[in-house]
Curated annotation (Swiss-Prot):
The keyword Membrane is assigned to this record: yes
SUPFAM superfamilies listed in its UniProt record: P-loop containing nucleoside triphosphate hydrolases
Short sequence motif named Effector region, residue ranges: 40-48
Membrane topology according to the record: Lipid-anchor
Gene name per UniProt: rab11B
Family: Belongs to the small GTPase superfamily. Rab family.
Residues annotated as binding GTP: 18-25, 66-70, 124-127
Stated name of the protein: Ras-related protein Rab-11B
Domain of life of the source: Eukaryota
NCBIfam families: small_GTP
PANTHER family the record matches: DRAB11-RELATED
Amino acid sequence: MVLKTIEYDYLCKIVVIGDSGVGKSNLLSRYNKNEFSVGKLSTIGVEFSTKTLKIDNKLIKLQLWDTAGQEKYNSITESYYKGAIGALIVYNIADRNSFNNLEKWLKKFRENAHQDYGIMLVGNKSDLKEYREVSTLEGKQFAEKHYMQFIETSALDSNNVETAFNNLFNFIYYSLFKNKTMTLDINNNGNNNSNIMVGDCEPIQFDQRYTINKPVYDCC
């Protein structure tokens, strides 16, 4: 029997959640491939992608889970929150209802995720300034109330997209991994589980291909 070699040092499962149509899939496409699709169809169930970062000569593999926002898929998508240690909870700044539903998404994530986690609240579609229904202050206050980071992004013009993901991972690394040992139960499509041991970590230095900023609660 041939044993598979694990080609990374750390594994980090992050889910992207929020109402249908807020731009979750395009945020991931912009972050992963620097692509944006006009008229992109809504996600059905769950889509999965990976991204590997090289940090201080260590490979960090991100599992990025794009979940459907429609109510009919809730029973499917919630099962994929298991083992997640990070979430981007996304709303559309031009859609008040998507903001009003944040409490629901936050509750579902906290009920199913790993006991230690980090959350980034993302007000997406910041390019739709003339149609804004949710102020930046409202987003910031919601994030502070629930102990989350906050940022506004535009998948269309790529504004703050990379920063949103990187700041979340930075928070997770320093707050959950640094000088701490954790075992993460990673659910691989519900088929099998693998325990990834996260050992003692030193302060990280990203190579020139990646930029990590200190966690922030607001941005322009």
